[in-house]
Amino acid sequence: TQRNRIPICDELCQRLPSTGLILEIASGSGEHGVTFQKRFPTLTWQCSDPDPEHCRSIDSWIRHEQLSPKMPAALQLDVRDANWQDQLSMPAQAVVAINLLHISAWECTLALLRQSAQLLQAGGKLCVYGPFCVDGQHVSESNHCFDASLRARNPAWGVRDQTTVLHQASEAGFAVQTITLMPANNRMITWIR
């Protein structure tokens, strides 16, 4: 988590709007979220996670970093939930998902694309970070081994195919804006609604 924060911040700096609400899906412990809120003080960073323990951790990080009331309390939100907008205090300008696609079932990827498309207005952005294979081929031996270890832990998990995800995003109403190669064989894909 710690080693990729700065490269992710640097990339998001080029992709996100300068003001408004950013919804982070599957925020985990909240370490990324508080880092992003501090890096982007003109944005409101809204963390979310389906796990109540993670939400408590996020809220603890917000208090520890003294980011309240600028940074709102975590939302207990599962990516598969409908009507994300009903839980938000204001419309979102972007949705961010970091290390979600490979440690969740394929249905979560589809839900992320579908629900983000419903939530975002024209011009809204979806930024997804993590490992991808390309046209069914792993981009490195380490990604191949990582994929095998994920699937051994849970057969529904695994490194997703970039081409397949791009197709599903297009079907949901997104146009790819950038695909950026990131450290440790990861990628940041940014779509625009």
Predicted regions and their residues:
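Conserved S-adenosyl-L-methionine
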Residues: 26
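A conserved beta-strand element that flanks and buttresses the S-adenosyl-L-methionine
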Residues: 96
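Conserved Class I S-adenosyl-L-methionine
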Residues: 139-163
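Core SAM-dependent methyltransferase catalytic element
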Residues: 174-193
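Conserved beta-strand signature within the Rossmann-like core of class I S-adenosyl-L-methionine
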Residues: 123-132
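Conserved alpha-helix/loop element of class I SAM-dependent methyltransferases that forms part
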Residues: 2-19
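A short, conserved alpha-helix within the catalytic core of class I
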Residues: 103-116
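Class I SAM-dependent methyltransferase SAM/SAH-binding core
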Residues: 23, 31-83
